[in-house]
Every structure is written in structure tokens, then in C-alpha cells.
Amino acid sequence: MYQSLAMAANHGPPPGAYEAGGPGAFMHSAGAASSPVYVPTPRVPSSVLGLSYLQGGGSGAASGATSGGSSGAGPSGAGPGTQQGSPGWSQAGAEGAAYTPPPVSPRFSFPGTTGSLAAAAAAAAAREAAAYSSSGGAAGAGLAGREQYGRPGFAGSYSSPYPAYMADVGASWAAAAAASAGPFDSPVLHSLPGRANPARHPNLDMFDDFSEGRECVNCGAMSTPLWRRDGTGHYLCNACGLYHKMNGINRPLIKPQRRLSASRRVGLSCANCQTTTTTLWRRNAEGEPVCNACGLYMKLHGVPRPLAMRKEGIQTRKRKPKNLNKSKTPAGPPGESLPPSSGASSNSSNATSSSSSSEEMRPIKTEPGLSSHYGHSSSMSQTFSTVSGHGSSIHPVLSALKLSPQGYPSPVTQTSQASSKQDSWNSLVLADSHGDIITA
């Protein structure tokens, strides 16, 4: 069981054992002050601490084995004249073990005082802490094996000779800050967080919004979203600054006159008719304002509009609904006959009324011998109304016609035949009447 301890101890000390600032560097036994050969203190490597039999209930035996191994490992590396059997650990008992620092070699200039040794231990502990944080768990195990001064060991409590160093870090820092409070009372440091006038970049003018009494040198504005400066350093409002930056000149203070609408142009009068009310103002060839009526008249006719056409009121266009013509059906005069598709009774009644009205409008001359031929005048008028389909278009023609018993002039006959192309029986009726003459 102890062969592994001896083999691990013979492999050499752990890394950092030969450091000049380490707490165990060049430590010797009590009688090694005059020896020219220096043997480092044998320490248990970190690989041994990970063994399971060194923890738990057998910690006391492991402590004895460790101390025995330490004392027995000394002669293996010692030269002639080295005192053997002087352990680096003076263990009085299993529970009351305390570390006694060995004497320092006279060849080195380290004074054997507790303060210098504490400083060296502090430097070594700092290096070990850095190595532990960077190397992970393996370095942590090595650090646990090398920290013999401030941690309880296997089964015994080791009293540390450096209680001040191992105290609370926060308390030590607070005490150090309180002891050295003089440098922190510098007015330079105290003025950093609470300066009354914070420095700003000269190009950033956004902080100037909160300043009081600032006025634009161009337009006199007291408030603006962003204060700007001109080339001479004077303050300009955002509008004046942008105008000066884009155009290179100062922003004009007089606003341009806003163009009034046609209904708000007060003071204008037509150069032709002198009216002051119009829906649209126009200009003539000379550039003078004229009303809409005079302008359109001059544009269409090329001459000025006569003053007699002037009206006090404005004539507007009477617009009709677009669907008005679609809803209405074509209407004729009261004497108009219905289409032939209607009933026979309605057709005959309409034909009678149309014939009576047509007879009243036009004079008809007949001879006594030919009266029998015109006994059915209603049928003849019905023929004309049926052919035309619209009484309004045929009535003026019938009103200008006259029937006379002097022969058959050809123009009237051709006109009647042309109007009755679709009805062949109409020509037969006209052929039977030998005595009527239609003259224009």
C-alpha cells in the first residue's frame, strides 16, 4: 500500500516547488544550515491526494504514512553530510499538528522574520490561485496538495501562522481603503461624477434646447427643436440654420404672399365687365384678370364680350342625372299611335284620334263624285300612322298636303309610295282612288 506513496514521492516534487518566492523553496532540516547541499522539502504530490484510501476513516494512518514517507524520502535525495531523520512537520498528535517553519539558509539574504515569510507566502498563494483558475480541476487538486498552511488536513486541524492574510478579503480591502483614504479625497476624483457644467462637443448643439435667453440672430426665435450656429458663431434656429446651410444666404424674414383661391381673391375685378364675382379668374392677352365668362367669350369668338351680356348672378350649368334617359321611354305627342303589337281595339282608337287631329290641321278638298272613295278616311290615316311608327315625324308632311280632283301628279305619288314600301296593300288603296291629287 505504501509502495505507491514512495514511487510517487521519488518522481520529484510538484511543479513550482523550486520557485524562489515559494513558501517551501529550499527548505532544509534543522541541522542543514552548514550543509552545502540543499534538499527541497519533500511534499506529497497531487496524484497521491486523489487516492481513495487517504480520505475518510483512515485519515490518521494516512497522515502518519505521509509524515513517515516525508522523513524517509529525505536520505534518498541527500548528499553526504546531510542530516537525516529531521521531518519538516512536527506532528505532536493526530489532532494537534502545527507547522513550524524551518530555518532559512544563511547563503540567501532572506531574513528569518515572520513578516518577510508572510509576504513570500502571499506571493506564492497568488500565483497558485492564478494557476488554479486557469488549469481547471487538476490544478485545483495540486493546489489542495500544496496549501499546507491554511486548510485543515486529513484528520487534524493545522493552525495557520498567517491569520491576517487569510482573513476576509472584503474586510481587508475596506480597512485598506479606510487607511489610505487620503488619495481618494482628491478634488479631481470627486469632480468626475457630479460636475456642474458637463463638457460637450462643440458640434453638438442639442443641449442648447434647455438654455435660457437664447435667441436666433436672424428671425429672433426663442425656441427651436435644434439650435445651430453660423460661420461667425452666432446662434440660429433650425430653420434659419438649414436655410443658410443650403442656400448660403440668410433666411428671408418676409414670408412670400400666399396665392389666394378663386373665391378668396379680394379686390380683383374683371377688366372687361368690372365684375368681382366669378367661379374662375382668367387672364386676357394683355395679362389682365378677367372673369370666366369674358375670358371664355374672348377665347371662343376672338372679340371682347359685350357689356349687355353681363349678369349679376352667376349662371351655372344645370346638370341632369345620367340615368334619367335610361329610365324614361321615348314619348311622342298625344296623337301618336302605339306599335302594331298592341291590341286591335287600342290600335283602332288611336288611329281614329290621329286621323281626326290630322284632318283638323290640313284642309282637304273632295269632289261629290269621289266622296265614296274617301268614305274610309280613318283607314287611310291609320295606314300612314302605321307605316311611320311615330306620328311626330309624319304630321308636318301631312299638314302640307292637299287633295284635289285634278289628275295624279307624279311627285306626290312617289312620295307616298316611298313612305309605304313595306306595306304592299297601301299602294293598292292609293291606286283605287282615281280622283285625289296630293300637291305640295
Curated annotation (Swiss-Prot):
Note the Gene3D superfamilies from the entry.
Erythroid Transcription Factor GATA-1, subunit A
N6-methyllysine modification, residue list = 299
Gly residues bias located where? Answer: 60-82
* Bias kind Low complexity: ranges: 338-358, 371-388
GO (cellular component) term, any one: nuclear body
**Composition skew (Basic residues), residue ranges:** 316-325
Q: How does it assemble?
A: Interacts with the homeobox domain of NKX2-5 through its C-terminal zinc finger. Also interacts with JARID2 which represses its ability to activate transcription of ANF. Interacts (via the second Zn finger) with NFATC4. Interacts with LMCD1. Forms a complex made of CDK9, CCNT1/cyclin-T1, EP300 and GATA4 that stimulates hypertrophy in cardiomyocytes. Interacts with NR5A1, ZFPM2 and TBX5. Interacts with ZNF260. Interacts with TBX18. Interacts with PHF7; the interaction promotes GATA4 binding to its transcription targets.
PANTHER family attached here?
A: TRANSCRIPTION FACTOR GATA FAMILY MEMBER, TRANSCRIPTION FACTOR GATA-4
Name assigned to this protein = Transcription factor GATA-4
Species of origin reads Rattus norvegicus
